C-alpha cells in the first residue's frame, strides 16, 4: 500500500512539472520581449497580435501617432508608454492583466487611453498627460495608483476597485470629482493641489492607514470607521467635515488653515492616539462635534479666533496643551479644571484668549508624586495674537520641541521633555508650537 502511494505521489509530481514546462514552453519566442526592445511604430505592435500572453516589459515611444495593442490578454511584466510626443490615442482593450506596472508618462498630446478589459495590475502611473480627457479601465485589483499632472476632469477608471495600497492624486488642475468604491486603503490616500472645486467621495471606505487632503472643496466618507495612522485636512475650501462613524484615529488628527470651514461632526470619535491640532481655520467660530472624545494620546493644540471649544467628554491628554484664541469671549475654565484634575499630563499647559492667559510649568517632582503639581500661574491683560505658522517659525520652534509617536498598533505619543518652562507672555511663540511642523511634514 505504501509503495502504491509513493508511486502515485511521484507520478503526480512528474505530471505537475511537465504541465508547468509545457505552459512555459507554450509561449512562442515571438511573444517574448527582449530587455531593450522599444516599439516606435504600429507595425512593431502588430507583431504581437497573435500573442495571448507577452513575457517581458513592453515599452512604447518614438513617433507613434495612434497606437493599439490587439488581442493580447496578459503581460507578464510591465507596459510603459513614455515620451511619445506625437501619440494622440492608445487602446489595449483585450488586455486583462499586467503583472507589474502600467505607466503612461510625458505624453504631451495624448487625449485618450482605453484599457476596457483591464482588471488586474500591480500599479498604475498616469504622470504628465496635459491633454488627456479620458482613461478607461475595469480595474478590480491594483496595489498602487498615482495620477499626477493630467487634464482629467474625473477619475472614472477605477469603479470596480475595492482595495488599494496607495491612492495618490495630485496636481490635476481640471479635476472636479473623484468617486470610488474602495473599501480599504492599507497605506495612504492622498489628494492634493487638484482643481479648487474637487469633490471627493469614498462612501464605501471603512478603514484606511493614512488620509491627507489638501485643496479639496468637499468630501464624503460616510462609512469610514478607523484611521490607523493620521488624518489631515490642510488648506481646503471645505465648509463642513462629517465623519459620524469614525471612532478611532491611531496617530495625529490635524485640521489646519481651512478658511471656509464652519462645522465639524465627529460625534463617534472617542480616541486619538497622537496629537489633536486645530489651527487657523478662520471661519470656525465654534469648535464642536467632538462630543465623545475621551482620550488624546499626544498634545492638544488649538489656535484661532474661536469663541468656544467643546471637549466635554475629554478625560485624558497624555501630552501638553496649547490653546489660544484671539476672541476675548473664549473661556479657559474647562481646560483649567481638566488640568487641575491631572487630565493634562504633559509638562506644559497654556491657555490664552484675547484678554488673558494662563501658563503653567509643572515641576519634575510632580511626575513622581501621583500627578501632584507645583504650578506657577501668570495672568496678563494684553491682547493675544493669532499665531501664523510660517515655515521659518515652525522649523525654529520644532528644534525646541520634539514629539515621539509609536507605530500604528500602539498609537501613543508623548510630549517633549527637557527645558520646557512655559511662562510665555501673550503673543510669544511657545516650544509646543513646534509640534505643528512635525504634523504637517508627516502627512504631506
From Swiss-Prot:
Q: What is this protein called?
A: Cell wall mannoprotein PST1
Q: Which residues form a coiled coil?
A: none
Name the species this protein comes from.
Saccharomyces cerevisiae (strain ATCC 204508 / S288c)
- The propeptide sits at 420-444
Induction of its expression: Positively regulated by cell integrity signaling through MPK1 in response to cell wall perturbation. Induction is dependent on transcription factor RLM1.
Function (record text): Has a partially redundant function to ECM33 in cell wall integrity. May be involved in a repair mechanism activated in response to cell wall damage.
Record note on biotechnological use:
Mannoprotein called haze protective factor from wine that is able to prevent visible wine protein haze formation. This mannoprotein showed haze-protective activity against wine proteins and BSA when either was heated in white wine.
**PTMs per UniProt:** Extensively N- and O-mannosylated.
Q: Where is the composition biased (Low complexity)?
A: 359-381, 395-418
